Amino acid sequence: MEEYKAVEEAAMKFVKSVTEGDSRYAKELFIDQAVLFGYLDGQLEHGSIEQFYKNVDSVGADAGFRARVDVVAVEETLAVVRVLEENWGGRIDFTDYLLLLKMDGQWRCVAKAYNQNSDTIQKQK
């Protein structure tokens, strides 16, 4: 149970960054080589986690944002976390999956994949 709590606490850095619109907390969670994959408003985003940092910092905080962290699985050095996000940027709902590895005694995120709920997509013009 201790490891589940440690994984949850690590994932909360992700939530805190999105809540406050400040990527500095997420930068403590993600390794520099972390990758992301998912669709934002119908456009595929993939590549460096830097894109996530830019999105968080440019959208900023929203008082209506809510999130829930579910620790799906924990093994000795591997964990999977689901994060449900509501009202990011005042309009978007996401389901994120974070893949964490225990590195040098700390849970660090190596990959983020996400789905934007279809009823919150704004197509690019």
Language-model segments: what does each one mean?
Residues E2-A6, V35-D93:
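Surface-exposed, charged secondary-structure patches
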Residues K27-E28, F37-Y39, V110:
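Short, hydrophobic secondary-structure boundary micro-motifs
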